[in-house]
């Protein structure tokens, strides 16, 4: 059945007459950028159903949505900056004009450590990574993002690429190559007059700093989508100093916890990730590394239901391990059987291993395939959970639309 609205057609025609792109442009179809950590990518992903007269298929759109803000929250030492850098590197590395702009208000790691986490060669690091750790304030941080935005949207012919994906109607999706901005951290960001010698005890109080940063977030958000800038905002979970317990700023923050910098940074985030570290790991046992178990919880998401968490493994030497994190996911979903040095995946009891040697075992192609197949099986359950069929014609005909029936009955009564 073909649908047509005279008002919609007339409205679009009037907008076209303005010749103003800001008036003409409509919402762009979202594209996900994998972070390299598949458990998170899938819990934040969606299934896209492409349906045209000639073809019909579904694909997984996983990872961080283009042109969005992601808040990373957690206590000190839980791995927020490490994970953010690794995710950022995995997003931009495949692109010729990919770029990371890192604002390090809390000083930062050595360049060699950052390059290791980004998994970049020395040449890539120099070409794609821009950082500063002095002279940062609210005003010039905005100016730098605005410059990035203007450079990209005014030179689309340089930065635009074919994603290779289609929207639900089969139209090819084109995007500007992604740029990642990292602010580390919001709690340390202050206005220029305060950083350049203003009196802390003067008119600029903690509350007014939060208000200025709130305006910053509101000004930056509209710039992100059109330029495909992904903004990672690192923030802390701090104890609430209030003597009277009050409702948490957002669900899945506990009573007595707060995030500094104002509530707008929470409400306007496309994703809010809570990072919680737990038990330590030692090289002489466990997984054969010195590190820690970490849970990543999707506190807020505009693509999937919130509250879902996945396990990850932080290796103190190399950062978060994609492979060990997948292994932790398989354990959580009870795909690892056996005990001690005689573990096996699923029903593959002919391929036994010790978890301390799991990384070595993955070098065996046959074992790697078993591992990947089991991982895909679990990941598919993560992306399917909370995803609904958007094709109206194919929705379950056993579902009864009570609301429509009641409204129709009311209209019938009025007509009689």
Label the predicted regions.
Residues 341-416:
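Terminal-proximal interaction/regulatory segments of ATP-powered molecular machines
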Residues 2-125, 143-147, 158-159:
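The Walker A/P-loop phosphate-binding site
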Residues 206-333:
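Phosphate-binding/switch region of NTP-binding enzymes
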Residues 91, 95-205:
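Conserved inter-motif catalytic segment of the P-loop NTP-binding fold
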């Amino acid at each position: 059945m073909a649908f047509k609205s005279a008002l919609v057609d007339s409205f679009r025609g009037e907008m076209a007459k303005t010749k103003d792109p800001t008036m003409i442009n409509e919402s762009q179809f979202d594209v996900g950028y994998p972070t390299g950590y598949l458990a998170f990518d899938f819990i934040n992903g969606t299934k896209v159903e492409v349906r045209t007269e000639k073809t019909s298929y579904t694909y997984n759109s996983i990872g961080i949505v283009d042109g969005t803000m992601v808040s990373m929250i957690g206590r000190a030492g839980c791995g927020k900056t490490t994970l953010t850098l690794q995710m950022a590197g995995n997003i931009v590395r495949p692109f010729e004009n990919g770029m990371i702009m890192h604002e390090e208000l809390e000083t930062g790691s050595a360049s060699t450590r950052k390059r290791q986490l980004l998994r970049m060669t020395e040449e890539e690091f120099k070409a794609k990574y821009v950082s500063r750790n002095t002279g940062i304030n609210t005003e010039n941080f905005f100016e730098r993002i605005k410059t990035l935005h203007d450079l990209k949207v005014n030179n689309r012919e340089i930065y635009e690429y074919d994603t290779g994906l289609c929207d639900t109607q089969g139209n090819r999706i084109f995007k500007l190559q992604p740029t990642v901005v990292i602010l580390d951290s919001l709690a340390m960001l202050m206005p220029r007059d305060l950083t350049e010698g203003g009196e802390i005890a003067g008119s600029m109080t903690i509350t007014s700093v939060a208000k200025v940063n709130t305006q910053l977030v509101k000004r930056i958000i509209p710039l992100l989508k059109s330029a495909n800038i992904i903004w990672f905002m690192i923030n802390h979970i701090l104890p609430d100093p209030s003597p009277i317990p009050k409702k948490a700023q957002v669900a899945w923050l506990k009573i007595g916890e707060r995030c500094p910098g104002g509530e707008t940074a929470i409400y306007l985030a496309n994703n809010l990730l809570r990072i919680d570290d737990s038990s330590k790991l030692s090289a002489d046992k466990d997984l054969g590394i010195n590190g820690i178990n970490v849970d990543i919880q999707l506190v807020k998401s505009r693509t999937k239901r919130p509250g879902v968490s996945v396990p990850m493994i932080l290796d103190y030497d190399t950062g978060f391990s994609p492979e060990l994190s997948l292994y932790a996911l398989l354990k959580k979903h009870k795909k690892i059987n056996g005990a001690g040095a005689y573990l096996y995946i699923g029903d593959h009891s002919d391929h036994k291993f010790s978890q301390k040697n799991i990384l070595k075992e993955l070098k065996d192609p046959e074992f790697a395939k078993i591992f990947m197949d089991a991982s895909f099986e679990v990941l598919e359950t993560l992306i399917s959970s909370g995803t609904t069929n958007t094709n109206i014609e194919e929705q379950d005909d056993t579902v009864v639309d009570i609301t429509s029936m009641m409204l129709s009955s009311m209209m019938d009564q009025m007509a009689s």
